[in-house]
């Protein structure tokens, strides 16, 4: 996939001025994987861990400060490391699967995670996407690691000792280990998971060392046994030792894993088998620079550069590539849906409820060939399970709501990609829109019978989050309609989805101008508090969800009484005190994150309202979008361990920043348009995959210069509040003239408003 030889001429170097000194560096040097790691159950500042990985890698590696099975695997405030874990965790809420760890120690053999743990300091820690190093003070050992796509190489620098050991922990819930001393090798598997796997699920691993073992033992349920070298148990592990080490001498371990077999794990080991540690490091750095170098940023503020490239790094981790390459060079995958080994693509560990909003549109803009592969993976997921996933980790998970695979599929078609079965995806979309997954309510459409009959899901039929589901289903129906229309499907098939796309109107309450729960008899629920985080909504309230009409803001404006009334409703979101509604239900972390940010009812730490500031563009007051978008970027995104204002969510919250800092955002994925905001950088160059470049300049921008006074496109005045994907694809030069005062004449005409489905229907398209 990646041609390292071509990088010499293609890696883009950035010039950043800091403390009066010019520095020349590469994109990956700005990335801080520790952003967002200062989090806990009660308050998320990202809920991230340092993912040491390749872009979209099958395996990530991370230092482990939490206990075995803890979703908070690494927290910045911790002071001890218990191991270095291979992880596939997309979120602490969904937790991990197939995980195992490795840990160097000195002294006496110790397997217990508390006894083997070591103090560490961030002052003796280096975290980069392609490399991690830390000094383990209690053992006087420096651990270094660098990953490939499916393997990794470790380097342990021990003190002078005859008692150096490496612990391999295959974790509990069913694991296997075998020490093969004649080959300096350990093999094993982990079956630990948090759901979403077939019964035959295993993560097979192989570990080889560069020297013989002076000590070897297997571990059964915590007990070290020198008499056994092979154990299958609830909790298996191994300890191997090395003697006669000189101070500073390095022990190298190479590790690979496979979800298919031990034999495939051996094939995957070839990624690092014949390479030195430095070669793997250099290749990882080059690969990250190729990916991050799709965007070249020039700016005077180094913290913003760190925030940007760290956000782009987070945007290119998930969904992970779950495929493997067999001995003939063919791409295969273990199906997390039916347990079979099958040919072709598979991607996983993403929740479409989060990532349809900006993560996948970002992939379509900057990495369309990668999303092409992801679409083939969706085709395979449908073949293997009968449904498109909504939250995959690695298979179907019971998490969140919506049928937003429709958005993922429809938005990808905007790039006019080829190479996957779009007709089968059409069948998959129709099936998912008219049925419910039998095992849980998060795949397909829970409550579809009511929605299809009444045009909404009633609040009195025991389908929770009914307002949120209904609104998302309406947007999903629009996506299905647009997808079918683009494929040339007959109107007899597509018309029903165009009709259902307007179902959002059925829950609009004219008396409050908000979306409100409605009973089966057509009456609104009586106990309505718009600030209450009630059961009709998903992780939010009426203020958050009433603007979730992504495909038809003009229709929503009409319902609310026109532009002035609509703008007033938007303004109100930022005015109502953040503590309103806090006692409406048991506290969840999203509520606290909104409260402490002190931006009224605007809850950027959660997805439903993230697009809302851009809606001013539809109502002839784009300067308010510019003000709020810039304020959100400046206040809520920092290059620090507490740098997010809620869950990062597999690239979604990061992709919001990436788009917004460029100066535009995909309010309605699959519409082919981006809505203009306030560019944050002096100069940006997008290096599109087709060879074209998009140059964005905003040299007058600053802390106070947040308003767009003028915009030119290829030297000509441009007053619209939107940008079309197809126009960017041709290459473009956008020059923003920024100002401290809003220009209340620019972007105020009806034709300047971005796409709305109501306008499309009026025009008869």
Predicted regions and their residues:
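ATP-dependent phospho-/nucleotidyl transfer catalytic cores
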Residues: 476
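Extracellular attachment/recognition segments
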Residues: 707
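Accessory carbohydrate-recognition regions in carbohydrate-active enzymes
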Residues: 23-407, 413-471, 479, 484-506, ...
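Bacterial Sec-dependent N-terminal signal peptides
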Residues: 1-24
